[in-house]
Amino acid sequence: MPAINVGIIGVSGYTGFELIRLLLAHPNFKMSYLAASSEAKIDEIFPSLRGVLDLDVHRADAKEAAKRCEVVFLALPHQEAMRYAKQLLSLGVKVVDLSADYRLSRELYEKNYCEHLDVQNLARAVYGLVELNRERIKGANLVANPGCYPTASILAVLPFLKFIDLDFGVVIDAKSGVSGAGKKLSASSHFVSVNENANAYNPINHRHADEIKFHLSNAAGSDISTLFVPHLLPITRGMLVSAYARLVKDIKPLEVLGEFYKNERFIRVRDEAVQIKNVAGTHFCDITAFAHEGKIFINSAIDNLLRGASSQAIANANLMCGLDENLALPMISQFC
């Protein structure tokens, strides 16, 4: 089949780089447009791409992107992404948005972020967690790529929704590498702040809390109480979730996981506690769970930049274009 032309707007960040790395290995997608807030050569932004990719990075322009591309990945901050998405969609381009702009209801979005400027497309967007919405993604023109914490948390809890006390809810203790804070420098991401340190941040009030609750409640068909606390670890990449809930019936957790995810290529059910090392650099989500005295512990691990962002975006684009969803998804971990 002929190559499908794709573009990235917001290419200069970590997720932009990961998209490039994956697209270079994609058999059907051809990078035809790269854009950021200013013009440059791609190897000036990422010197590791010298001799690998010779493309100019343009100042972002939706009309120019639409001329060159059938699919555009938006790796932009919230609010900025929706401005481009609205234009691209009106020009017939499929959009995978890695920001938060289309993940929530209008009410929850405006509670956590800002006024929504594209309510019409917000109502049409499909939440791009493949294991949850595979068939809907196939027919979508706009996919909202899930956040990293919600990806790891929802995939962990989803199989157990009919077995846990929804009123008591679920407590989610999540930990991320520093790359989750993005490329822009802040006081909390300085080496001296992160090294030999670990801390909770934005406990209870993190923006991803409502994304997790919203999509778990939709999946359960009933409101579920959630308590979400993220932590920062002194590692570059990776994410670990520990979730706790009260059971309403006796189950064998590994059997539940195995049955629920039996057809999912990139979900690995483990019989021991999961490790970031085994998933870093891959699209895999490793999950395990243990029951004890009427309670359950669920443990998941992902790569926050890949399964939590860029490789998930590739999987969504694959489905949107009628391709094998697993094309170009990384499988070998960066173990050392």
UniProtKB/Swiss-Prot annotation:
Catalysed reaction equations from the record: N-acetyl-L-glutamate 5-semialdehyde + phosphate + NADP(+) = N-acetyl-L-glutamyl 5-phosphate + NADPH + H(+)
GO molecular function, a single term: NAD binding
Enzyme Commission no: 1.2.1.38
GO biological process: L-arginine biosynthetic process
Pathway, per record: Amino-acid biosynthesis; L-arginine biosynthesis; N(2)-acetyl-L-ornithine from L-glutamate: step 3/4
PANTHER family referenced in this protein's UniProt entry, alphabetically: N-ACETYL-GAMMA-GLUTAMYL-PHOSPHATE REDUCTASE, CHLOROPLASTIC-RELATED, N-ACETYL-GAMMA-GLUTAMYL-PHOSPHATE REDUCTASE, CHLOROPLASTIC-RELATED-RELATED
Protein name in the entry: N-acetyl-gamma-glutamyl-phosphate reductase
